[in-house]
Amino acid sequence: NGWAAVNIRAVAAACGVSVGCIYNYFGSKTELVSAAVESIWNDIFRHPEDEAVFQDTLSCIQWMYRQMEYGCPQYPGFFTHHALGFVQQDTAGGKQQMRQTWQHILDALCSVLRHDAKVRPDAFTEQFTPEQFAGILFSLMLSAVVQQSFDPSAVLEIVRRTIY
């Protein structure tokens, strides 16, 4: 039912329990939404059966874009709501949840960049680190989500020209 259904009363009704039962687990709508967001990100970026996607940066990016493309119809409005909704929240908890969720993706990208045997030895420096490049790649990924454009070919070419 979309994001409108992610509230204490709707979840209680869907589960056939009292509102108080839901409040035993979630103290506020923000906590409930945060748990839903984390669960959805975990579903979209669940660990792939084929570990080869983490062997090189190009394979990882292709996999990430495929997963985002999968996630859009599975969870309509999720990406734009999460990308924009938590940023606009005044609550520190919502912003912290967003940072934690995204940090997991950034950490995975950094790990792939560091272990990718195809990366030129001089590709990264003190002024241009794997963390910075992962941040750039992640920004491009968020842009793709907002635009609903899941063709990674331009991003793949940027990777080839920048670090290979």
Predicted regions and their residues:
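Hydrophobic alpha-helical connector segments
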Residues: 35, 49-74, 130-134, 156
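Amphipathic alpha-helical packing segments from all-alpha helical-bundle domains
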Residues: 73-77, 81, 90-119, 128-131, ...
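Short, charged helix-capping/linker segments at alpha-helix termini
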Residues: 4-5, 120-128
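Helix-turn-helix
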Residues: 1-31, 35
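Amphipathic alpha-helical interface segments
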Residues: 1, 25, 43, 67, ...
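Helix-loop "lid/cap" segments that line or gate small-molecule binding pockets
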Residues: 50, 65-73, 81-89, 112-113, ...
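Short, basic, alpha-helical segments at the C-terminal edge of helix-turn-helix-like DNA-binding modules
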Residues: 38-45
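Short helix-capping/turn signature of helix-turn-helix
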Residues: 3, 26, 82-90, 143
